[in-house]
A protein has these predicted regions:
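Short secondary-structure boundary/hinge segments and terminal tails
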Residues: 34-35, 53, 122-125
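Residues within well-ordered alpha-helices
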Residues: 12-13, 60, 101-102
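An N-terminal boundary/leader segment
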Residues: 1-47
Length: 126
C-alpha cells in the first residue's frame, strides 16, 4: 500500500505511476483501504467493483493524463458498462450495457474506476 496516497492530487499520483515510483495496483490498494475505512460512516460509495478495477490495473490501463489513478464515478446519468445505474432513486435500477460518452472519455485518460458514489435522487437538491 502507498502510505503517502493522500498527500498527492490526481496529477501527482499519475506522475508517480508514469515514473514507475508506484504502481496502479498500489494506488488502488490505498484507495480501496481508505474506502473500506471511511465509507461505513459516510455511505458515499454505493456500488463497488474493486475486482474489475484490479483486473484493469493488472491488464494495463490506457496511457493518458491520469493513468493508474483510482476514480469514483457519480451515480447520476453516467452508464458504465456492466454496472448498475440508479441515479440515487429506488425506482431506477438499470444494468448498463454500454459506456456513456463521459465514461469513455474518462477511461481514455487512464483512470481506474472502482465504484460509483451516492447522489440525491436524480441529482435534485430542494
Amino acid at each position: 500500500m502507498f502510505k503517502e496516497y493522500t498527500q498527492y492530487d490526481a496529477l501527482g499520483l499519475a506522475d508517480l505511476v508514469s515514473k514507475g515510483e508506484v504502481s496502479a495496483k498500489e494506488l488502488l490498494d490505498s484507495a480501496v483501504a481508505r474506502a473500506n475505512k471511511l465509507n461505513p460512516k459516510l455511505n458515499a460509495i454505493i456500488h463497488r467493483f474493486d475486482e474489475r478495477a484490479y483486473d484493469q490495473a493488472q491488464a494495463g490501463l490506457p496511457s493518458g493524463a491520469f493513468t493508474g489513478v483510482p476514480y469514483l464515478l457519480k451515480d447520476l446519468s453516467y452508464s458504465f458498462e456492466g454496472e448498475p445505474l440508479t441515479m440515487g432513486s429506488r425506482s431506477v435500477n438499470i444494468q448498463s450495457d454500454y459506456d456513456s460518452e463521459i465514461v469513455k472519455r474518462m477511461k481514455a485518460t487512464g483512470v481506474n474506476t472502482f465504484g460509483k458514489t451516492n447522489t440525491p435522487e436524480f441529482g435534485l437538491i430542494i
